[in-house]
Design a protein with these regions (language model features):
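Extracytosolic ligand-binding ectodomains
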Residues: 1-217
Length: 217
């Protein structure tokens, strides 16, 4: 962020032990530095405690928040009507997607498990699809042959097509970015868009300058 926006100043940092957050003291310390906004990466039970405490103190929605993962159904189902409006988040608006790949995946997932998919469901499915595609391309399960086959490999995900970049073997599978809102007493994502990974990954020149040449042998 500092590289893109040198004017941004981080006025404080809090690193609560995962699963053991003291939301009150964490927020007290954070707000003592008078931030214009908060960048959050807590999740699970820690996120629920932080949101509840912040709502009670009127920190949210008064102070803008950018939060990773918080738009995922795994966490919105826990937050319920405490979901903080206006947070900018990454997530998974599963009930609003209308692309063919996702419609088929979601319908089959519900039929199999009698529940709606979560982000973990999507990642697991996409991982298996990539493995299947790699084995098919390599026509082998040999490790080295699979490594070679997966460079530039294209595969299908519920979010749409993705690939492993040949230059650094990174997946281009992206993420949904939007804002949180409450509808029917439940948290949901609004004003969302799909951020395709290939549009945000480092340039070839950047990768070559930092990645050992023998890593691609």
């Amino acid at each position: 962020l500092k590289a893109k926006r040198p004017d941004v100043e981080f006025v404080s940092e809090q690193w609560p032990a995962q699963g053991k957050i003291d939301a009150g003291s964490t927020l007290t310390a954070t707000m003592a530095s008078k931030p214009d906004a908060i960048f959050n990466v807590t999740f699970g039970a820690d996120l629920a405690k932080l949101v509840r405490e912040g709502n009670q103190r009127n920190v949210f929605p008064k102070t803008p928040v950018v939060s990773l993962l918080s738009g995922e159904p795994e966490y919105l189902e826990v937050l319920k009507d405490e979901t903080p409006k206006g947070w900018i988040v990454t997530g998974y608006p599963w009930d609003q997607l209308d692309n063919k790949e996702h419609a088929s995946f979601a319908a089959n997932y519900y039929k199999k498990f009698n529940e709606n998919p979560k982000v973990g469901s999507v990642v697991g499915y996409a991982t298996m699809q990539a493995i299947f595609a790699g084995i098919k391309k390599a026509n082998s399960t040999d490790n080295e042959k699979l490594v070679t086959a997966m460079r530039g490999l294209k595969f299908v995900t519920p979010f749409g097509p993705a690939e492993f970049r040949a230059i650094d073997q990174q997946s281009t599978m992206g993420a949904y970015v939007g804002k949180l809102d409450l509808r029917g007493g439940k948290g949901t994502m609004v004003q969302w868009r799909y951020a395709d990974g290939k549009s945000y990954q480092p340039t070839d020149a950047y990768v070559k300058a930092r990645r050992p040449a023998d890593a691609m042998k």
